[in-house]
């Protein structure tokens, strides 16, 4: 059998305020499908952190895309609320497709995120698009296909 990656399983995002981010992403259409606290040798070996205690929540969209939110209780992750720059070395953004960019922008702002009201049209005219931020400053790209 030939080696092959078959799909993107999920995107994991370390967060400071788990419940706030669950509410935010729920308002964008994600539904909680699983939530668990973990500690012990298995999770220590997996994440390579001694005496780790964490909690994770898996949230799913209708198309089965999964977002995993992780809260490290011990040792806690350093949190510095700042808007992430799109050109930093690391992951850049989470791109979400919406059927109404205007309504999605309203929800993002209503539930603690930050989005300008003005979106762009792609040069080919096929999509409306905007970069914005969740309540902890992570970059979201919202795309509406035309």
Per-range role (PLM):
Residues 1-22, 31-34, 91-96, 146:
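N-terminal beta-strand motif that seeds the catalytic metal site of vicinal oxygen chelate
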Residues 2-3, 35-37, 55-60, 67, ...:
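Vicinal oxygen chelate
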Residues 7, 52-53, 90, 126:
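Exposed loop/turn and edge beta-strand positions of beta-sandwich/beta-sheet ligand-binding modules
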Residues 14-64, 110:
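Core segments of cupin and vicinal oxygen chelate
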Residues 40-45, 76-82:
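A short, acidic/glycine-rich surface segment
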Residues 65, 75-76:
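Active-site/binding-pocket entry motifs
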Residues 84-88:
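Non-DNA-binding regulatory cores of transcription-related proteins
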């Amino acid at each position: 059998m030939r080696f092959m990656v078959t799909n993107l399983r999920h995107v994991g995002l370390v967060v400071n305020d788990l419940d706030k981010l669950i509410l935010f992403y729920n308002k964008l259409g994600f539904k909680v499908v699983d939530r668990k606290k973990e500690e012990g040798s298995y999770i220590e070996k997996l994440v390579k952190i001694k005496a780790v205690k964490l909690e994770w929540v898996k949230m799913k969209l209708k198309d089965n895309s999964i977002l995993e939110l992780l809260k490290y209780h011990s040792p806690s992750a350093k949190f510095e609320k700042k808007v992430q720059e799109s050109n930093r070395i690391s992951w850049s953004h989470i791109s979400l497709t919406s059927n109404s960019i205007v309504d999605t922008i309203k929800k993002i702002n209503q539930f603690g995120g930050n989005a300008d009201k003005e979106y762009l049209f792609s040069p080919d005219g096929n999509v409306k698009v905007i970069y914005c931020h969740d309540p902890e400053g992570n970059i979201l790209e919202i795309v509406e296909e035309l």
